[in-house]
From Swiss-Prot:
Superkingdom of this protein's organism: Eukaryota
GO cellular component, one term: nucleus
Protein name: Protein HIR1
Keyword Coiled coil: yes
Keywords: Chromatin regulator, Coiled coil, Nucleus, Repeat, Repressor, Transcription, Transcription regulation, WD repeat
Gene this protein is translated from: HIR1
Length: 1080
C-alpha cells in the first residue's frame, strides 16, 4: 500500500488553502475532479499524481479549472459514460460541463499563478431548481438521469439527455445531504438531517421524456430510520454508497447505542443488522469499491463452481480524521489510517479498477491510497460484476465499446433517429410550425425535402424557381403580422377611467416561427399526425346496439369441476332453506282466452306503478339443459333506434330520434296481448319507408346502411334490406338472443345458452361454427353445484370488427377475441398485466416519435435518403384501394380493451389491495426481476394480439417497443430470435419458392417466409428493429450483420449510392450468403 499526498494537489489561494469538499474519478480513470471553497472545479491528471515522486515526469498536473459558480462548490461528479461533468454549489446552481475536442482558446489567467489549461471543458448547461445550497449529486448508471439534493429539503431529478427538470420530490423534513444509486438501476437512496434514508423506485426515462411523463415515476419505496434515531446533526455531509453487487447500502452518520457507526442496510428487507464500528466521531462519507474481489487468487482454469467467494470493499471517513477500509469477509477493518488530515474528511472516490482510493479533506489536502495486488483481494472481472446484478434484473448493458466501424455507424443512426423523435415531440409540445404551401414538400425536423422525379439527394432547384412558391408563405406571415399589430394597439379602459394598451398574451402573439434553429422546428401537419401514442384511426369495433345493464349481462354456470362430497342429508337441508317462503312468482296465468300476463300485485300503498317493460320473455326449455345461462332481455312495449349517417345510435324516444332530419328511425312495437303480432317499421322525416309484422314479440333490433335485423323471443332472427325487403328466411337459433350486433355485412348474435353466432349476410354464410362463451366465463374452474348454477362474470359488451371477428369484454376486466382460424378464444387483456407491467395503459413516447420520424415506412425517409419502399404508389388505372382498406382493420382494439380492464379494475375497488400485494411480492427473495419479466411478457402479449387481429399500426408500434425493451435488458436470445423471424425469406434468392408464403403473398405468423408480416413488409420492420437495437453495443455483433444486408452501414450506403449512379455491387448478396451459412 502506498499513500500519495503531493504538495501541489490542493486548492491553493493567496493566503490559505481552501477546503476541498468533493472529489471524483472519471470512468476511464485518467482524471480526478475536485471541488473546493475557492469556487473552482479542478481536473487533475491521475497519471501525474501516481508519478508525483518522479521529478522528471513531464506530463501536466492540472488539466483544467472552471470557475463558473459564485460560491463554494459542494459536489462534483463525472457521468458514467465520461461525457459530462456535473458540479453543485451554494449558489443554488448545477453546472454541466462537456469536454470540447478543440484546444483551449486562452492561456493562463492574468494575475494568477494558475497553469495554462490543457483540456477545454465548456459549460454545457446551467440547471436551476433548488432554493438553497446544492449539497450532493449522483448520476444513474445508464446516464439517463441526474439527481441533486440540497439544504432546501428537495430531491430534484434531471434528464441525463436534455437536462430538463423531470420531477421535484419533497419528502424529507430537513436538509438532504447524500444521494446514491442502485447499480441495478432500479432504486436510488437519499439521506437527510431528518434522520431518514428514503429509497425511491424508478424506471429509466427515455431520452425525450418530459415532466408530464414522469408523474408516476420516482415513487417512494420505503423509509429507513432505525439506525439514525440519535445521530448528530453536526456533519456537513451524509454521503451514502451502494455496493457493486446491489445487495447493501452503506449509510454514514449512523449510531449503535452511544457509538458512531456506519449502517449496512440490506436490500429488499431494507433493515440494518450490521454496523461498522470503529470511528471515534461521526462519519461524513462512506464509499464502496466499484469492483468485487476474490478472497483467494482465482486460477486461470477455475470453473464457476470452484471459484472462490466474492466480497465487497468499503471505505469510510469522517470527523475523527481517520480513514477505515473494510471488506465483507472479516469483522475488523483491513486497514485504519489515522490523522491523515488535520480536519474532517469530506469525500472519497475509487478508481474504476478498485485498487486506488482518493480522499479529500476540509484542510485543503487530497491524498491517494494505492493498494498492491492481493492486499484487498483479487479484482473480479466485469462479467462477474454483471452476473451478480442479474438477479435484480440489471446490468451495465450498452456501456461497452463499439463492435467495429459498422457498429459505430449503426449506433449513430440509431441515436439520430431518437434525437429526431425527441425534437419532434418537443416541437409538438411547443407548437412549432412553419407556414407552408400545399404544394411544397413538408420538411420534418430540418431534414431535406423528399426528392422528386428521381432526383438524387442533395440536388436542389435554382432559387429563381423557388421564389414563386414562397409567395403564399410570405403572404401568410404578413397577415399574421398585421393581426399582431392590431392586437398590440388595442386600448382598454380601466375602472378609474384611465386608458391603457391591453396586455397581449405571449401565446397569442406567436408568429409561427420561434427563435430556435431551423433544425428544431417541426411541420404542423407532421406534428399533429405523428406524435400521438395511439393510432390515428377510429376504433374498428361495432357500436353497441342496445344498452346493457350495469355490470353486464348476468351469467350463471354449471361448472365442470366437481365439488367435494357432502354429508348425507346436508343437500336436502340446503335446498329446503333456499325455497322462497311466499312461493313462486307467476309470470303467466291460464285464462279461458289463453295465456295472459300475470297481473301486478298491489303494493302496500295501493298504487300500481307503471311498468318499464311488458313482461319477461318466455324462457326457452333449452336453457334448462345448458351449462351456461345468460339473462334474457325483457319484452319492452316500444323500441326506437335512430340510424345516423349509417351508424346505429343508442335507444331514445321517437321525438329525440326525429330531431335530425337525415336520421332513419327504426321503430318496433310489441303488443300487450300475446296473440297480437309485433309491428316494425322504418321512417325518415316522419314519412314511413317500410313496415312489417312479426308473429312473436321483438326483444332486440340492430342495423346499418346495408341491412336491418330483429330478434324475437322465440329465438328467431329476421333480416331486411334498407328498403324493407326480406333478405333471408327466419334464422332459428337454439334459444333467445341476448346480444345482437351488426357491422357492415356481418351480424353477431349471442343466445341465452352462451352460443355465439356470426353471419355474413352478403355471402349468406357463417364465419365459423357456433362457439360457446363457457370457456371465457371460467367454467373450467367453477364447481358443479347441486343447489343450482354459480354466478359467473357478466358480459359487458360484444363487438364485431370490420372483418367479422368477435371481441367480448367481461365484468372482471378481461377482454377476449375469437380466432376463426384456430377455433379458440384468445385473452387480449386482463388485470394481471395492470398489476405487473410497466407498459400498462401507456406507450413509449420515444418509440411513437421514432416510428414516424426515423423508421416510419410511410412519411419518413430511410437512412440513405431515398423514399421508403412501402410508400404506396398508385396509377390512374389501378388505385391502391386494398392498402387503404387494410390500414384500419382492428385499429384501437387492444388499447380499448386495456382501458376497459382499468375501468372495471378500479370500479371493483381492488386496485389498492392488489397493488399492495404486488409490492409485498417484489420485496421477497426470488422476485427481483418480476416487474421486468412481466413487462416484457405484456409486450409479447400485445404483439401476438395485434398480429392475430390484423391491427397493422399497433403491431408495428408494439414491435418497436418490444425491440427497445429487450435490447435494454440485454436479452440476446430473444433479440436473435426476433431478428431471425423478421428476416423470413428475405435471404432467399428472387424466384425461389417460399415455404408458407402461399399464393396470397402474405404469410401469417412469425414462421412464414412471405414478404409481408402483420401488414408490413418484413424489410421495413427489420430495418426499424435494427435501428432501435443499433445503440446497444453488447448486441452489435448480432445487429451489424443485419444492418449490412439492409445497407445501413457505411459500406452499404456507399455501395447503394454506386448502384444509383449506375455501378453494381454484390456485397449485400455476399453477406446474405454468409448469414445463410451461419444459420445452417
Amino acid at each position: 500500500m502506498h499513500i500519495i499526498k503531493p504538495s501541489w494537489l490542493r486548492h491553493s489561494g493567496e493566503q490559505k488553502d481552501f477546503e476541498v469538499y468533493s472529489c471524483h474519478i472519471s470512468p476511464d480513470g485518467s482524471r480526478l475532479a475536485t471541488a473546493g471553497g475557492d469556487g473552482h472545479v479542478r481536473v487533475w491528471s491521475t497519471k501525474a499524481i501516481f508519478n508525483a515522486d518522479h521529478p522528471d515526469h513531464g506530463k501536466p498536473r492540472q488539466l483544467c479549472h472552471m470557475s463558473h459558480h459564485l460560491g463554494t462548490i459542494h459536489s462534483v461528479r463525472f457521468s458514467p459514460n465520461g461525457r459530462y461533468l456535473a458540479s453543485g454549489a451554494d449558489d443554488r446552481v448545477i453546472c454541466i460541463y462537456q469536454l470540447d475536442s478543440n484546444p483551449p482558446s486562452h492561456t493562463a489567467t492574468f494575475g494568477t499563478n494558475e497553469p495554462p489549461p490543457v483540456e477545454n471543458w465548456k459549460t454545457h448547461k446551467r440547471l436551476v431548481g433548488h432554493d438553497s445550497d446544492v449539497q450532493d449529486l449522483a448520476w444513474s448508471y445508464d446516464n439517463s438521469i441526474l439527481v441533486s439534493v440540497g439544504l432546501d429539503s428537495k430531491v430534484v431529478v434531471w434528464s441525463g439527455h436534455t437536462f430538463e427538470k423531470l420531477k421535484t420530490i419533497a419528502v424529507h423534513q430537513s436538509h438532504v445531504k447524500g444521494i446514491t444509486f442502485d447499480p441495478a438501476n432500479k432504486f436510488f437512496a437519499t439521506a437527510g438531517d431528518d434522520r431518514h434514508i428514503k429509497i425511491f423506485r424508478f424506471t429509466p426515462p427515455p431520452p425525450n421524456a418530459t415532466q408530464h411523463d414522469m408523474v408516476n415515476n420516482f415513487v417512494l419505496e420505503t423509509t429507513i430510520s432505525a439506525p439514525f434515531k440519535s445521530s448528530p446533526l453536526t456533519t456537513y455531509f451524509r454521503r451514502c454508497s451502494w455496493s457493486p453487487d446491489g445487495n447493501h447500502i452503506a449509510a454514514a452518520n449512523a449510531v449503535n447505542g452511544p457509538v458512531s457507526s456506519v449502517a449496512i442496510i440490506e436490500r429488499s428487507r431494507w433493515d440494518s443488522e450490521i454496523n461498522l464500528i470503529g470511528h471515534e466521531g461521526p462519519t461524513e462519507v462512506c464509499m464502496f469499491s466499484p469492483r468485487l474481489f476474490h478472497t483467494q487468487k482465482p486460477s486461470d482454469n477455475a470453473t464457476d463452481k470452484g471459484s472462490p467467494g466474492l466480497v465487497t470493499v468499503i471505505a469510510s471517513a469522517g470527523q475523527d480524521k481517520t480513514l477505515s477500509i473494510w471488506n465483507t469477509n472479516t469483522s475488523r477493518p483491513v486497514v485504519i489510517l489515522q490523522d491523515v488530515a488535520s480536519k474532517s474528511m469530506s469525500d472519497l472516490a475509487w478508481t474504476p479498477d478498485g485498487q486506488t482510493l482518493f480522499a479529500s479533506s476540509l484542510d485543503g489536502t487530497i491524498l491517494a491510497v494505492k493498494f498492491e495486488m492481493g492486499e484487498l483481494g483479487w479484482v473480479a472481472t466485469a462479467e462477474e460484476n454483471d452476473k451478480a446484478l442479474q438477479k435484480y434484473g440489471g446490468s451495465r448493458k450498452g456501456m461497452g465499446t463499439a463492435e467495429d466501424v459498422d457498429g459505430l455507424h449503426l449506433e449513430n443512426h440509431s441515436k439520430e433517429g431518437e434525437l429526431r423523435g425527441a425534437e419532434s415531440r418537443m416541437g409538438a409540445l411547443m407548437g412549432d410550425f412553419q407556414p407552408e404551401d400545399k404544394g411544397k414538400p413538408v420538411t420534418t425536423n430540418g431534414s431535406r425535402p423528399t426528392a422528386k422525379n428521381g432526383e438524387a439527394n442533395g440536388t436542389t432547384e435554382p432559387k429563381e424557381k423557388e421564389a414563386p412558391k414562397a409567395a403564399p408563405a410570405e403572404e401568410n406571415v404578413e397577415k399574421t403580422a398585421e393581426r399582431i399589430a392590431e392586437l398590440k394597439s388595442r386600448v382598454q379602459v380601466t375602472k378609474d377611467g384611465k386608458k391603457r394598451v391591453a396586455p397581449l398574451l405571449v401565446s397569442s402573439s406567436a408568429t409561427g416561427l420561434l427563435s430556435l434553429p431551423q433544425s428544431q422546428l417541426v411541420g404542423a401537419k407532421s406534428t399533429k399526425t405523428t406524435q400521438s401514442d395511439t393510432p390515428q384511426t377510429i376504433l374498428d369495433l361495432s357500436k353497441p346496439s342496445h344498452g346493457l345493464p350495469r355490470g353486464g349481462i348476468a351469467a350463471m354456470l354449471l361448472g365442470n369441476k366437481r365439488k367435494a362430497a357432502a354429508m348425507e342429508g346436508e343437500e336436502e337441508d340446503e335446498l329446503a332453506g333456499r325455497r322462497p317462503s311466499a312461493g313462486p312468482v307467476p309470470i303467466l296465468i291460464d285464462t279461458p282466452e289463453g295465456l295472459e300476463p300475470a297481473p301486478l300485485s298491489a303494493p302496500a300503498q295501493g298504487v300500481v306503478p307503471t311498468p318499464e317493460y311488458l313482461r319477461p320473455a318466455v324462457i326457452s326449455p333449452a336453457i334448462s339443459f345448458s351449462q351456461t345461462r345468460l339473462a334474457v332481455p325483457k319484452v319492452r312495449s316500444h323500441i326506437v333506434r335512430p340510424l345516423e349517417k349509417g351508424v346505429l345510435q343508442g335507444e331514445s324516444t321517437l321525438d329525440e330520434a326525429s330531431k335530425v332530419p337525415e336520421n332513419i328511425v327504426l321503430e318496433a312495437k310489441n303488443p300487450i296481448r300475446l296473440r297480437e303480432p309485433a309491428h316494425i317499421s322504418a321512417s325518415k322525416r316522419g314519412a314511413r319507408l317500410w313496415q312489417d309484422y312479426l308473429p312473436r314479440a321483438i326483444i332486440l333490433v340492430t342495423g346499418n346502411k346495408h341491412f336491418w335485423a330483429a330478434a324475437c323471443e322465440d329465438g328467431s332472427v329476421h333480416t331486411w334490406t334498407p328498403a324493407g325487403r326480406r333478405l333471408l328466411n327466419g334464422i332459428i337459433l337454439e334459444s333467445q338472443p341476448v346480444i345482437l350486433e351488426s357491422r357492415e355485412h356481418w351480424l353477431l348474435c349471442i343466445t341465452s345458452v352462451g352460443l355465439c353466432h356470426v353471419f355474413n349476410i352478403k355471402t349468406m354464410s357463417a364465419a365459423h361454427p357456433p362457439v360457446s362463451l363457457a370457456p371465457i366465463l371460467d367454467i373450467a374452474i367453477t364447481s358443479l353445484s347441486l343447489e343450482g348454477p354459480t354466478p359467473a362474470p357478466g358480459v359487458t359488451s360484444a363487438h364485431l370488427n370490420s372483418v367479422g371477428a368477435v371481441v367480448v369484454t367481461l365484468s372482471n376486466g378481461d377482454g377476449f377475441y375469437y380466432s376463426s382460424t384456430m377455433y379458440a378464444w384468445q385473452r387480449l387483456s386482463e388485470s394481471w398485466w395492470a398489476l405487473g407491467s410497466q407498459y400498462w395503459n401507456s406507450n413509449d413516447s420515444s418509440i411513437s416519435a421514432l416510428s414516424t420520424t426515423a423508421v416510419g415506412p410511410v412519411t419518413a425517409k430511410n437512412i440513405n435518403g431515398t423514399a421508403s419502399s412501402t410508400t404506396t404508389t398508385t396509377t390512374p388505372d389501378k388505385p391502391d384501394t386494398a392498402a387503404t382498406a387494410e390500414v384500419g382493420v382492428s385499429a384501437g382494439i387492444i388499447p380499448h380493451l386495456e382501458r376497459h380492464t382499468t375501468s372495471e379494475f378500479l370500479l371493483k375497488g381492488r386496485a389498492f389491495t392488489l397493488q399492495r400485494l404486488i409490492k409485498t411480492l417484489l420485496s421477497k427473495d426470488g422476485f427481483e426481476g418480476f416487474e421486468s419479466t412481466v413487462s416484457v411478457a405484456h409486450l409479447e402479449n400485445r404483439i401476438a394480439g395485434a398480429l392475430a387481429l390484423g391491427a397493422r399500426e399497433e403491431f408495428r408500434l408494439y414491435l418497436f417497443m418490444y425491440a427497445k425493451r429487450i435490447g435494454a435488458e440485454g436479452l440476446r436470445g430473444k433479440v436473435e430470435e426476433l431478428l431471425n423471424c423478421l428476416v423470413g425469406g428475405l435471404l432467399q434468392q428472387k424466384g425461389a419458392p417460399t415455404n408458407g408464403g402461399g399464393g396470397s403473398g402474405e404469410a401469417k405468423g412469425w414462421f412464414g417466409k412471405g414478404e409481408m408480416l402483420g401488414g408490413w413488409e418484413r424489410r421495413e420492420l427489420l430495418k426499424g428493429v435494427v435501428l432501435i437495437l443499433g445503440k446497444f453495443r453488447d448486441l452489435q455483433r448480432l445487429t451489424v450483420q443485419y444492418a449490412r444486408i439492409l445497407g445501413l452501414t457505411a459500406d452499404g450506403e456507399d455501395e447503394e449510392n454506386d448502384d444509383n449512379n449506375g455501378g453494381g455491387g454484390g456485397e449485400n448478396g455476399a453477406v446474405a450468403e454468409e448469414m445463410e451459412l451461419e444459420e445452417q
